[in-house]
């Protein structure tokens, strides 16, 4: 295919990309011989050593038999051998490009099948489902609106019928009552007419006259009662009519409010229906766009499948090579597991031996401290940075001394030679000083550590104080006091819970930090205490304090077991430091406080 990513193979070209000029028949024979020699399985072995995310690393190893075969084939001509090697490099390059193109096409096809098609299908299904749900909701709302309208009409008709029934019922009752009264009046009138006619025909009789008067009086009384009953009936009818009018007004108000609410709900539903119709139109347009995109993706997928099929055919021989190299890789991994097992065994042995060495080193440090205590001389440690020392000085670790090669050869022996750490946390210095401190802390004997340096020593003092507080804070009641070298100012009882205060106190170079350890932790326990003096001086200050007696330093030296730590690096005057260390070794003797 013209658009394939598989590079073409090329053979028989000079370094300047110029094809050699020889006859076509001869050229084909030479190419056949060279290709047979390159592709023969006995000439080259492809070993895949590692497989990682960046690809497959390959290396080719030529057998000695291949070189011998080349010599026999071409008669040992170096030009032909060089040309064969060039062709072999091009074949390797073509194989690498084929592998890269195959991996890219596989990644693209996997990405299309695994990500884009499912996402588009899910999106289309979701939009179709949403359209159906919206249509169902619109139909339901329309049905509900029709039901509400029917209910309103039915209630309106029921109210009108009930009011008409009530009026008709009361009208019938009034008419019946009037009919009864008229019937009674007509009967009474007829009777009285008969009687009157009889009376007129007869002579007047006093008894009848009296009876007529009495009846007339009763008739007037009955008329009066009838008038009263008619008035009462009219009043009750008016009151009942007013009550019915009030109830009817309340009923109309309630129904009117319901109608207003229904009108508002209908208006809101109309807006919702309009919005849903607009959304439905937009969704139709989106569905149309998605269908176009889907058709485009189908075309692209078809093209990718065609390319993928062609690449699968090209990958078949490479898969065979990959299977053979995978077997070789499996064998290498098994050998790697065996080597890792042996390495773990050696690691365990190393850890055990390291523990023994550390224990022996700790015992040797305690013995060295005891020997130094017996000798009675002051202890001098060298805290050296060999990378920053001048060339004329070097460290002899066996004899624990620093040697000067320029001029007169000078050797200064120290009790310890401690190498300064790269990260400068000064814990190695503390580990070297702890045997000296433990010996006197266990016996509650005052001791001191003085750092001799021209440079700032606050980090060293801070590390010593912090490590001492962490190690002995649970078994002793501890207080930190500040004593200036002139003896004029003294700060006492500084809190140890705040690391900021310890850092601020250790920044002062012109004072001694006094850490007091007291065994009295409870009220009933006895109090036994000792002091640990931690300070720093330059070589000039230390010489001056030693010469000017009495002084604060001379008082500390006579009352404590002291240890001097000399910093040895490019920023120090190493000659003066070595001379001062020798002077301290010769002149100062430890007090016998044990």
UniProtKB/Swiss-Prot annotation:
Keyword terms, alphabetized: Coiled coil, Cytoplasm, Cytoskeleton, Microtubule, Nucleus
Stated induction or repression of this protein's expression: By alpha factor.
Location in or out of the cell: Nucleus; Cytoplasm, Cytoskeleton, Microtubule organizing center, Spindle pole body; Cytoplasm, Cytoskeleton, Spindle; Cytoplasm, Cytoskeleton
The keyword tRNA-binding is annotated on this UniProt entry: no
Cited Pfam families: Microtub_bd
GO annotation, biological process: karyogamy involved in conjugation with cellular fusion; meiotic cell cycle; mitotic spindle midzone assembly; nuclear migration involved in conjugation with cellular fusion; regulation of mitotic spindle organization
One cellular component term from this protein's GO annotations in UniProt: nucleus
Disruption outcome: Short mitotic metaphase spindles with splayed microtubules increasing spindle width. During karyogamy (nuclear fusion) of mating, abolishes the formation of a microtubule bridge between the two nuclei thereby leading to a failure in nuclear fusion.
Disordered: region residues: 1-29
Molecular function via GO: cytoskeletal anchor activity; microtubule binding; microtubule motor activity
Residue stretches in coiled coil: 81-360
UniProt-listed InterPro entries: Vik1/Cik1_MT-bd
Note: Present with 98 molecules/cell in log phase SD medium.
Subunit relationships: Interacts with KAR3; the interaction is direct.
Function: Together with the minus end-directed microtubule motor KAR3, involved in spindle midzone assembly, karyogamy (nuclear fusion) during mating, and with an essential function in meiosis I. To contribute to spindle midzone assembly during mitotic metaphase, the KAR3-CIK1 motor cross-links anti-parallel microtubules to align them on the spindle axis; as the motor travels polewards splayed microtubules are pulled into alignment.
Protein name as catalogued: Spindle pole body-associated protein CIK1
Organism: Saccharomyces cerevisiae (strain ATCC 204508 / S288c) (Baker's yeast)
Gene name for this UniProt entry: CIK1
């Amino acid at each position: 295919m013209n658009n394939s990513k598989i590079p073409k193979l090329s053979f028989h070209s000079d370094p300047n990309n110029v094809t050699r000029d020889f006859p076509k028949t001869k050229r084909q024979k030479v190419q056949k011989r060279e290709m047979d020699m390159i592709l023969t399985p006995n000439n080259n072995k492809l070993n895949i050593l590692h497989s990682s995310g960046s690809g497959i690393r390959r290396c080719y190893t030529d057998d000695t038999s291949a070189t011998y075969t080349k010599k026999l084939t071409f008669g040992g001509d170096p030009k032909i051998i060089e040309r064969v090697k060039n062709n072999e490099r091009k074949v390797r390059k073509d194989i690498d490009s084929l592998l890269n193109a195959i991996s890219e096409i596989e990644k693209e096809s996997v990405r299309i099948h695994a990500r884009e098609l499912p996402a588009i299908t899910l999106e289309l299904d979701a939009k179709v489902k949403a359209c159906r749900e919206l249509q169902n909701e619109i139909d339901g709302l329309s049905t509900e609106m029709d039901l509400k309208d029917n209910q309103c009409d039915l209630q309106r008709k029921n109210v009108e019928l009930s009011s008409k029934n009530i009026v008709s019922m009361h009208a019938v009752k009034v008419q019946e009552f009037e009919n009864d009264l008229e019937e009674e009046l007509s009967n009474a009138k007829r009777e009285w007419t008969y009687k009157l006619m009889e009376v007129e025909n007869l002579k007047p009789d006093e008894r009848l006259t009296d009876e007529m008067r009495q009846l007339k009086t009763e008739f007037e009384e009955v008329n009066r009662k009838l008038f009263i009953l008619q008035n009462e009936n009219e009043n009750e009818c008016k009151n009942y009519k007013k009550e019915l009018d009030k109830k009817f007004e309340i009923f109309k108000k309630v129904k009117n409010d319901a109608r207003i609410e229904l009108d508002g709900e209908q208006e809101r539903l109309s807006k919702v229906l309009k919005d849903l119709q607009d959304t439905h139109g937009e969704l139709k347009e989106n569905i149309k766009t998605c269908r176009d995109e889907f058709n485009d993706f189908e075309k692209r997928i078809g093209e990718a499948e065609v390319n993928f099929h062609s690449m699968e055919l090209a990958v078949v021989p490479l898969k065979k090579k990959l299977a053979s190299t995978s077997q070789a890789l499996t064998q290498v991994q098994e050998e790697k597991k065996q080597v890792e097992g042996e390495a773990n065994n050696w690691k365990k042995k190393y850890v055990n031996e390291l523990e023994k060495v550390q224990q022996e080193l700790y015992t040797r440090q305690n013995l060295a401290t005891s020997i130094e205590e017996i000798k009675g001389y002051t202890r001098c440690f060298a805290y050296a940075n060999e990378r920053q020392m001048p060339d004329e000085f070097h460290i002899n670790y066996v004899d624990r001394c620093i040697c000067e090669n320029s001029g007169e050869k000078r050797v200064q022996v120290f009790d310890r030679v401690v190498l300064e750490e790269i990260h400068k946390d000064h814990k190695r210095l503390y580990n070297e000083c702890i045997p000296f401190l433990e010996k006197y802390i266990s016996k509650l004997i005052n001791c001191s550590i003085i750092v001799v340096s021209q440079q700032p020593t606050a980090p060293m003092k801070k590390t010593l104080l912090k490590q001492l507080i962490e190690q002995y804070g649970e078994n002793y009641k501890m207080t930190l006091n500040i004593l200036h070298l002139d003896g004029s100012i003294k700060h006492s009882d500084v809190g140890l819970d705040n690391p900021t205060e310890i850092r601020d106190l250790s920044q002062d170079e012109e004072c001694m930090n006094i850490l007091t350890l007291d065994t009295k932790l409870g009220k009933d326990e006895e109090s036994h205490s000792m002091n640990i003096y931690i300070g720093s001086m330059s070589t000039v200050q230390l010489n001056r304090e030693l010469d000017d007696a009495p002084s604060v330093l001379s008082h500390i030296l006579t009352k404590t077991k002291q240890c001097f730590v000399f910093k040895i690096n490019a920023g120090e005057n190493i000659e003066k430091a070595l001379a001062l260390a020798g002077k301290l070794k010769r002149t100062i003797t430890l007090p016998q406080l044990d």
